[in-house]
């Protein structure tokens, strides 16, 4: 709106107000009446045309009420122009009146501010209406109509949506209601699992193939089970029982032919083709194919030769004793035995067997000759062409023929036992055969070129740890003293062990005295001829004696005082790390740390730097402690849960050192041992 037009409208309003005051009965046209009615109807929304007041108090009210005057002013201006020809007054234009009338400066400022405020309000309303016109509810009439239309549309949409749903559900109910599910399942014979698989996968063809395949497999399994149920189960007998059965058959049926005996044999041991048994014990008792070939001739006849006595050498089972297996021995077959002269210096001992109290000859190789080394190498690196089955010999040296020996069929550990003495050690012995070295240790000692005496040089007496601290004294130096070989500990460590040595190839006695003058003393030395038998050794008066004095090598190398000094000299951080490494309880003070480590040094070998070794030693100590408590052992064997408090208390009763062990370490050990622990 233009500023001039607004000012003109205001002047017209003033004129209309003056005319209304001058005339008692103002002439009102029909248009004016219509406009008045509209103003009365829209009092809430439209502002009546009121003249501006000069008072400042009425300014605020005029701002609120005067809003839509410009539209009305235009209409009134047209009405005044229409009424102008009827009046007698001369027509004066509005512009002339505005030019003639000059308002005061104060009124002019006030009018300008009021007009500008009204103009701003009008522009704001126009902008707001333009924005509201973009919405659906621009007016009350349009909004009510639109609400009705939308409600009708919603009803139509809901009707359209619900109708297809009803039709769909009705179709589904029709399909499900036609035949009952139980009848269809009974008619088609569909199992519950098959139905579930169909529902889950939806691939009916694949499911049918899978189920048919499974049914065929089950049918085959049933047929195999039925066949196996008709098969006769066979009992297993050892060789003595089988010989007893054969003897009874031949006594009761002397006219029985070999085929009948064969049928009895197959009834006991089963057919040759039926060797695949589910039971491992039955499979282990089946005779070997080689034994069956030896038992039967080419005409499928059984050797009917029966021994007269049951305790014959043919039925005797040869079993190696534990001492034969663990000792440094080698079994040499009779076909491969080589005759070695006494100059080869080989000691032969007779070790009693644990089953039949008969002696088996075991050869111990001590010499360092190349020939013996080659024999050991051949026995160690045996070729694959040799027989893989273990050979057992009787006293007569013949294999058991015609008798099923369970030991040959079920035990296939090794082909032969040979000496673990390596070729490298033999060669080193051969190089140093001119020198004799005696190690000052508690372990066994070997000699390379010393004579064949009745004493095993490996059987050096070992000292008891409790008695090793006492100093040794020489009891006997008799040249004729001999002793029997016994690998036992001496009850008294204060003994000087005397060894008889024949044919001493000693270059000088100073070499031995220089090595260890305290432990080895040359008593006497003579030139002795080599004898051919043990009797000549006993009758010989000239002997070379070497005296081996038992020393205090069993005493601990580190005294407890030294250990205490070493531990106390370490820092607190190092002590704490040692406690963590061993698996002991963490403590705060250094004195308690030293106490715990001292207790561990008395029980464990704390010299090991490796954490795994220290933990394993601690676990072994706990295991040895738990074995001393029968009640806990019985609970552990029955897998009964044990409380941590109970376990620790009982371990402390056995050994107070358990009080220093951390609970986490005990839990790890219990987990390894399979002990079930529960909280207190």
Curated annotation (Swiss-Prot):
Phosphorylated in response to DNA damage. Residues 15-92, 141-183, 450-490 are annotated as: Disordered. Residues 156-174 have a biased composition (Basic residues). It is found in: Nucleus. Residues 473-490 have a biased composition (Polar residues). Residues 22-33 have a biased composition (Acidic residues). GO terms for biological process: DNA-templated DNA replication; double-strand break repair via break-induced replication; double-strand break repair via single-strand annealing, removal of nonhomologous ends; interstrand cross-link repair; regulation of DNA damage checkpoint; regulation of DNA double-strand break processing; regulation of meiotic DNA double-strand break formation involved in reciprocal meiotic recombination. GO terms for molecular function: 5'-flap endonuclease activity. Keywords: DNA damage, DNA recombination, DNA repair, Nucleus, Phosphoprotein. One of its GO terms (cellular component) is Slx1-Slx4 complex. InterPro entries: Slx4_ascomycetes, Structure-sp_endonuc_su_Slx4. Pfam families: Slx4 (PF09494). Residues 60-86 have a biased composition (Basic and acidic residues). It comes from the Eukaryota. Forms a heterodimer with SLX1. Belongs to the SLX4 family. Regulatory subunit of the SLX1-SLX4 structure-specific endonuclease that resolves DNA secondary structures generated during DNA repair and recombination. Has endonuclease activity towards branched DNA substrates, introducing single-strand cuts in duplex DNA close to junctions with ss-DNA. This is Structure-specific endonuclease subunit SLX4. It comes from Vanderwaltozyma polyspora (strain ATCC 22028 / DSM 70294 / BCRC 21397 / CBS 2163 / NBRC 10782 / NRRL Y-8283 / UCD 57-17) (Kluyveromyces polysporus).
């Amino acid at each position: 709106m233009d500023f001039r037009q607004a000012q003109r409208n205001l002047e017209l309003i003033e004129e209309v107000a003056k005319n209304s005051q001058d005339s008692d009965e103002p002439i009102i046209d029909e248009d004016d009446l219509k406009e008045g009615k509209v103003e009365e109807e829209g009092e809430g929304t439209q502002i009546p045309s009121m003249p501006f007041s000069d008072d400042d108090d009425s300014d605020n009210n005029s701002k609120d009420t005067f809003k839509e005057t410009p539209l009305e002013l235009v209409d009134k201006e047209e009405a005044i122009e229409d009424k102008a020809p009827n009046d007698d007054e001369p027509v004066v234009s509005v512009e002339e009146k505005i030019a003639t009338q000059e308002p005061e400066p104060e009124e002019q400022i006030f009018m300008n501010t009021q007009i500008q405020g009204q103009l701003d309000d009008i522009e704001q309303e126009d902008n707001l209406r333009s924005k509201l016109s973009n919405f659906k509810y621009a007016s009350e009439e349009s909004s009510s109509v639109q609400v009705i239309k939308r409600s009708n549309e919603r009803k139509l949409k809901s009707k359209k949506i619900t109708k297809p749903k009803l039709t769909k559900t009705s179709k589904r109910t029709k399909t499900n209601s036609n035949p009952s599910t139980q009848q269809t399942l009974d008619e088609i014979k569909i199992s519950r699992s098959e139905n579930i698989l169909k529902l889950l996968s939806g691939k009916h063809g694949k499911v049918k193939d899978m189920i048919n395949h499974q049914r065929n497999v089950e049918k085959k399994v049933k047929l195999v089970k039925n066949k196996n149920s008709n098969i006769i189960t066979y009992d297993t007998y050892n060789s003595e029982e089988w010989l007893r059965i054969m003897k009874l058959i031949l006594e009761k049926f002397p006219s029985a032919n070999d085929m009948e005996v064969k049928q009895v044999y197959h009834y006991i041991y089963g057919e040759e083709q039926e060797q695949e048994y589910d039971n491992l014990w039955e499979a282990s008792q089946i005779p070997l194919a080689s034994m069956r070939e030896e038992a039967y001739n080419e005409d499928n006849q059984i050797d009917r030769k029966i021994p007269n006595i049951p305790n014959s050498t043919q039925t005797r089972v040869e079993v190696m004793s534990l001492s034969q297996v663990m000792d440094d021995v080698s079994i040499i077959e009779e076909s491969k035995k080589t005759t070695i002269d006494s100059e080869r210096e080989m000691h032969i001992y007779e070790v009693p067997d644990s089953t039949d109290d008969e002696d088996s000859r075991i050869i111990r190789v001590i010499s360092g000759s190349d020939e013996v080394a080659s024999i050991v190498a051949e026995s160690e690196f045996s070729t694959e062409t040799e027989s893989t089955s273990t050979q057992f010999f009787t006293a007569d040296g013949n294999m058991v023929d015609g008798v099923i020996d369970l030991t040959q069929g079920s035990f296939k550990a090794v082909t032969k036992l040979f000496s673990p003495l390596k070729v490298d050690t033999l060669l080193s012995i051969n190089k140093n055969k001119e020198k004799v070295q005696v190690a000052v240790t508690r372990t066994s000692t070997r000699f390379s070129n010393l004579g064949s005496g009745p004493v095993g040089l490996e059987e050096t007496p070992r000292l008891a740890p409790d008695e090793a601290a006492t100093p040794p004294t020489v009891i006997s130096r008799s040249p004729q003293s001999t002793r029997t070989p016994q690998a036992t500990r001496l009850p008294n460590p204060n003994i000087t062990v005397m060894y008889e040595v024949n044919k001493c190839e000693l270059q000088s006695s100073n070499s031995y005295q220089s090595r260890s003058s305290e432990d080895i003393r040359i008593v006497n030395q003579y030139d002795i001829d080599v004898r051919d038998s043990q009797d000549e050794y006993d009758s010989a008066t000239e002997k070379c004696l070497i005296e081996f004095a038992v020393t205090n090598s069993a005493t601990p190398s580190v005294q407890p005082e030294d250990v205490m000094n070493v531990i106390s000299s370490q820092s607190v951080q190092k002590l704490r790390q040692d406690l963590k490494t061993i698996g002991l309880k963490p403590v705060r003070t250094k004195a308690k740390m030293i106490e715990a480590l001292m207790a561990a040094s008395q029980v464990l070998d704390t010299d090991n730097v490796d954490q795994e070794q220290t933990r394993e030693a601690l676990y072994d100590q706990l295991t040895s402690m738990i074995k001393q408590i029968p009640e806990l052992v019985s609970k552990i064997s029955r897998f009964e849960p044990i409380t941590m408090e109970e376990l620790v208390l009982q371990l402390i009763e056995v050994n107070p050192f358990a009080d220093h062990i951390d609970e986490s370490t005990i839990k790890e050990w219990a987990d390894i041992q399979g002990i079930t622990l529960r909280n207190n």
